[in-house]
Curated annotation (Swiss-Prot):
TM stretches of this protein: none
Gene Ontology process terms (BP): chromatin organization; DNA repair; regulation of transcription by RNA polymerase II
Nucleus listed as a keyword: yes
Role this protein plays: May play a role in transcription or DNA repair.
PANTHER family reported in the protein's UniProt record: ENHANCER OF POLYCOMB
Protein's name in the database: Enhancer of polycomb homolog 2
Ranges annotated as biased composition (Polar residues): 654-669
Species: Xenopus tropicalis
Gene designation: epc2
One annotated Gene Ontology cellular component of this protein: nucleus
Keyword presence, GTP-binding: no
Predominant place of localization: nucleus
């Protein structure tokens, strides 16, 4: 213990430790003066903690006054003991519980607020409890939400109402108190927070920072004295040297490029001197860069949607290195956009295309990055604009045409331009496709002028209107004026003549007056379109159809086409399935009216027979001399005449040895195909006759309907595989059942016999109409099979009518 100062060394197990007895140990006062070699700080604290101002004041006071003063000490909170308060909080009775940790898995603990009330808050709470009940925990939760929602800027009252789900008065009171207390508070928040280190380094010397970030310190050897500052200086020096080396390399590259440019300039001058290019013409021609063209093979687009990948083949032209070495900016001319011709100029006839050469693009107008397609040699086109100035001056704006790389564009052919339906003469199907007709709409009932019907997407019917000089006049036309001839004009095909073209149509449309236009529509020289009405099966519409049936049919009838001859029966004309269904509905309705009228007549005849039996016999004898009325004959003839395609069907009998025609009765002979018919009552007066629409089946390609007249007779008509002819003589009318007929269809004009039938029917208006009593049998027989007759129009009886 001779040395008063020593340095602590590690214990050596090989070295024996000295043993001291109690009398050899020095006293405590003697050991106080021993100082170790490792110096200790007077406070025993770290270097950062010594800078605390309370500690420095205490140390400086001790050094000045050489004694310890009570006022100059480090502030330490005093520990006080209040036994009475402690005994009130903690009772003396204590029982050890069975378990110290209680877990309630199904109950979630409510989050406790970080804010704690103070005496000032308690005063406000007592004042608020006078008007409403509010708990301390509820008040702490409100203040806590306001504090956490605010950072440097306080929340507004509207935002506070969204945060707090309380009464508006309570929210406003708490909010005003919180704002006032927050402004008076010196700290950043009312909730006490642990002080942490700031990133700007301002809290490095603050001893009250609780948590600091770990600083990465360099491990240096103490014997060489390499600290962190010297290491950072070396890194900075290395970066500066690297930057200087990079700058020198770039300067070296720049000077080398200048030298190469000087050599190339000398070579160009020598070549120009040898070529004699003193004006620079050859040099300017070489400076124009040649554009490389690429040919892209576009994969074919299949109809089934499967696009097979086709390898692209890019064919590049030979590259000239002398062209690409010097790329100079060339002033590019502005792209010219020719004005589009107006609609009036399209109507004028286009002159014949001449064999003038196409304009060639100047190569100087093309920039370096303007790529032309593979067709530029044959059909050169102007490249697309690239500058924003040109795009602004472009009349099309953002919708201007621009070339797309890899696409092939073909120039328009001058010989096919302006080939529109309005400028060319069309004939046949093309003329019907592009023609415009005078059109009438059903709902609302009005005329819209000239229009063209076409089929749009989804099956919609679209009307394309055509503007003419007479639009104001045509729209004032009464649609009822066109109803008489609209059906025939829009169904019948106009006569196709080579002299009638669209030019003549335009002449009629633009120069004719209103009466001339109407006369042209009536004579089918000008087309008129009117939509067809749908035929419904409602009872109300059936009554309207039955009332207007005669008037419509009389208007449509032009001639009756039925001929009888000695050697055969010739039937001219036919009707369509749609017209047949329309006539069938009208006939069924008229048949019902006839049946009701017949029943009324029978009741009146029975009453007259009981009162005047002799008068009934004379009336019955006069009944046989009277025949068919005019309305029934005209309606029967209209079933044949009113058809879209006029035609004639001739039915010729086989002229064999045993055939004879006695008073219009055709004798059956051999076997042949049967004529199918449909029985339907037809008359405006009760009980006159029954009209049949006969379907002739003599050839696979022929299918015609023949209107016939069947008078009811007490005798029955028996039918079998071959139709037997049954004849009923009524003065000048005979009913014939044709058998063994061969049908040939050909187009012809109405026969004289048909015109004779119309004349006879018109003269019969003066004959009084008498209802035979035997007509009920045919009507009753017709009512047994209404469904089968409505579907296919086939019946078991086949009769024809002959007027003598």
């Amino acid at each position: 213990m001779s040395k008063l100062s020593f340095r602590a060394r590690a214990l050596d197990a090989a070295k024996p430790l000295p043993i001291y007895r109690g009398k050899d140990m020095p006293d405590l006062n003697d050991c106080v003066s021993i100082n170790r070699a490792v110096p200790q700080m007077p406070t025993g604290m770290e270097k950062e903690e010594e800078s605390e101002h309370h500690l420095q004041r205490a140390i400086s006071a001790q050094q000045v006054f050489r004694e310890k003063k009570e006022s100059m000490v480090i502030p330490v909170p005093e520990a006080e003991s209040n036994v009475h308060y402690y005994s009130r909080l903690y009772k003396g009775e204590f029982k050890q519980p069975k378990q110290f940790i209680h877990i309630q898995p199904f109950n979630l603990d409510y989050e406790q607020p970080d804010y704690d009330m103070d005496s000032e808050d308690e005063t406000l709470l007592n004042r608020l409890n006078r008007k409403m009940e509010i708990k301390p925990l509820q008040f702490e939760i409100m203040i806590d939400r306001l504090e956490k929602a605010s950072s440097n800027q306080l929340v507004t009252l509207q935002e506070a109402k969204l945060l707090l789900n309380e009464d508006d008065y309570l929210i406003k009171s708490v909010y005003d108190y919180w704002v006032r207390k927050r402004k008076n508070c010196r700290g950043p928040s009312l909730i006490p927070q642990v002080k942490q280190e700031k990133r700007d380094g301002s809290t490095n010397n603050d001893p009250y920072v609780a948590f600091r970030r770990r600083t990465e310190k360099m491990q240096t050897r103490k014997n060489r004295k390499n600290d962190e500052v010297s290491y950072e200086k070396m890194l900075k020096l290395r970066r500066e040297f690297s930057r200087a080396i990079t700058i020198l390399e770039m300067i070296k590259r720049r000077e080398k490029t200048k030298r190469e440019l000087l050599h190339l300039t000398l070579e160009v001058v020598e070549k120009r001197y040898n070529l004699g290019d003193f004006g620079g013409e050859i040099l300017n021609e070489i400076k124009i860069p040649k554009v490389e063209k690429e040919i892209h093979v576009i994969p074919p687009s299949l109809h089934n949607g499967n696009h097979h990948k086709v390898p692209e083949c890019k064919v590049k032209n030979t590259h000239h290195p002398s062209v690409k070495d010097e790329v100079l900016e060339i002033v590019r001319l502005k792209k010219k956009y020719p004005k589009k011709p107006k609609a009036e100029t399209l109507v004028t006839p286009q002159p014949q295309a001449t064999s003038e050469p196409l304009a060639v693009i100047n190569k100087s107008d093309i920039k370096q990055y303007d790529f032309q397609s593979s067709d530029d040699d044959e059909f050169p086109q102007v490249p697309s604009p690239l500058s924003e100035l040109e795009e602004e001056n472009d009349p099309d704006g953002s919708y201007a045409f621009r070339r797309r790389t890899g696409c092939q564009y073909y120039a328009p052919r001058l010989d096919q331009m302006n080939d529109t339906p309005e400028t060319t003469d069309l004939s046949g199907l093309a003329r019907h496709r592009y023609r415009h007709c005078l059109t009438t709409l059903t709902v609302p009932r009005r005329c819209i002028g000239f229009a063209r019907k076409r089929l749009g997407r989804g099956g919609r019917v679209i009307m394309d209107r055509l503007s003419t000089e007479h639009d104001s006049i045509l729209k004032q036309i009464d649609p009822e004026m066109l109803s008489g001839f609209s059906s025939s004009s829009h169904v019948a095909q106009p006569p196709s003549s080579p002299s009638r073209t669209n030019a003549s149509d335009r002449h009629c449309e633009n120069r004719l007056s209103l009466p001339e236009i109407l006369s042209n529509i009536k004579s089918c020289r000008l087309q008129c379109f009117q939509p067809r009405l749908l035929h419904t099966q409602d009872s109300d519409r059936e009554e309207c159809t039955s009332r207007l049936g005669q008037a419509v049919n009389v208007k449509r009838v032009s001639a009756a086409l039925l001929n009888t001859s000695k050697n055969g029966i010739t039937v001219t004309g036919g009707i369509t399935e749609e017209q047949f269904q329309t006539h069938q509905q009208q006939l069924v309705q008229m048949q019902r009216q006839q049946l009701a009228q017949l029943q009324q007549k029978q009741q009146s005849q029975q009453s007259l027979q009981q009162s005047h039996p002799k008068a009934q016999g004379s009336a019955k004898s006069d009944c046989m001399s009277k025949t068919l009325d005019s309305a029934s004959a005209l309606f029967a003839a209209s079933a044949v005449v009113n058809s879209p395609t006029p035609g004639r069907s001739e039915v010729n009998k086989d002229q064999n040895a045993g055939h004879s025609n006695l008073n219009g009765v055709v004798q059956p002979s051999g076997t042949a195909k049967t004529l199918y018919s449909t029985n339907m009552a037809l008359s405006s007066s009760p009980g006159i006759s029954t009209v049949q629409l006969v379907r002739t089946v003599g050839h696979p390609t022929t299918n015609h309907l023949i209107p016939t007249l069947c008078t009811s007779n007490p005798q029955t008509l028996t039918m079998g595989n071959s139709c037997l002819a049954n004849t009923v003589h009524l003065n000048n009318v005979s009913v014939v059942s044709p058998v063994n007929v061969h049908i040939n269809t050909r187009t012809s004009a109405p026969s004289p016999t048909a015109l004779k039938l119309a004349t006879v029917a018109a003269s019969m208006d003066r004959v009084p109409k008498v209802t035979p009593s035997s007509a009920i049998s045919s009507i009753a027989r017709e009512n047994h099979e209404p469904e089968r007759l409505g579907l296919n129009g086939i019946a078991d009886t086949t009769v024809a009518m002959e007027v003598t």
